[in-house]
Every structure is written in C-alpha cells, then in structure tokens.
C-alpha cells in the first residue's frame, strides 16, 4: 500500500501599507518610544528658535499638523466620514476618541468655565508630553503641552470653528 502525503501551503501575498484599510488596527506605541520621540521633537524645535515663545509656537504648529491628520483618520475610522458640527460634540470627541488614540486613555475632565460661556477646559492631571521633558532653567516658562494645544486647535478648525483659541 502506497500512501502519498500531499502538503498544500498557502502563500500570503505581500501587502503594502497602502493596501491596508483605514478602519483596521489601532497600533500601540510603547511609552519609552513615545517619550524619546517627543523629547527629540522638542530638541529639534529648540535648535531652530531663540526664545521660549518661539519654541512654543513651533510646537503648536507641529501639533497642528498631527491634529489635521488625526482628525481625518479618526473621522474615517470612527464616524464613517461624518464630522461633528456642534461644539460640545466636537469637544467630547477630542476628550474621548482623539485622546485615546494619542495617549492611550481619555482626558480626565472636560469643564465649562463659569465666567465665560465660550470657554472650555480639557483637563489632564498628568500630561504625557510634560512628563518626560526636563526643562532647562533658562527656559523655565516652557510648557510642552503647547504641542497638544496645536492638536486641539487643528481639530476645532477642521470642524469649522473660528480660530480664537487660548
């Protein structure tokens, strides 16, 4: 009796990143990698400016670039291409969906100011962008959260709100 073994193997075709769906996968980046990347971004900006306000402006501009891209990606992924047009809904989108995508968790609070009906605060008790950056004494007023402010500004601008932030 002669038994032949037949082996069939399926060879997966190689797919490029352009072939993957936008709705697939939410990649995670390690905290140490994120910290290194962000500290290098701050150093890059620091080497190209002379004052702390210029540095914060540069970080805000870079954050805005991230914000525009994240808005497009998350709107396609989460909302099926439909953008929110009401302020509170956009702010809740930023607090939850955007924050989870960027920092792995929601922002701690979204508060409405008592004295001004047009002022809202997104509160994060321990900001990831300030956690791993040591500020030199000569740049004591530097707040690296201006990067995140740029992201929020871009999302609000992309949602059709007038640029009158901060």
Task: Give the predicted meaning of each segment.
Residues 1-142:
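N-terminal accessory segment detector
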Residues 129, 138-166:
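C-terminal non-catalytic interaction appendages of large macromolecular assemblies
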């Amino acid at each position: 009796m002669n038994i032949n073994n037949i082996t069939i193997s399926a060879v997966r075709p190689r797919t490029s990143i352009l072939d993957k769906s936008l709705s697939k996968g939410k990649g995670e980046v390690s905290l140490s990698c994120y910290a290194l990347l962000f500290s290098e971004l701050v150093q890059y900006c620091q080497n190209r400016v002379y004052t702390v306000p210029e540095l914060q402006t540069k970080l805000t501009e870079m954050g805005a670039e991230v914000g525009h891209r994240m808005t497009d990606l998350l709107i396609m992924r989460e909302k099926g291409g439909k953008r929110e047009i009401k302020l509170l809904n956009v702010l809740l989108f930023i607090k939850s969906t955007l924050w989870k995508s960027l920092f792995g968790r929601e922002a701690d609070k979204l508060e409405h100011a008592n004295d001004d009906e047009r002022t809202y605060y997104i509160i994060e008790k321990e900001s990831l962008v300030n956690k791993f950056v040591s500020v030199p004494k000569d740049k004591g007023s530097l707040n690296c959260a201006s990067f995140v402010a740029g992201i929020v500004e871009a999302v609000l601008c992309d949602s059709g709100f007038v640029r009158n932030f901060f």
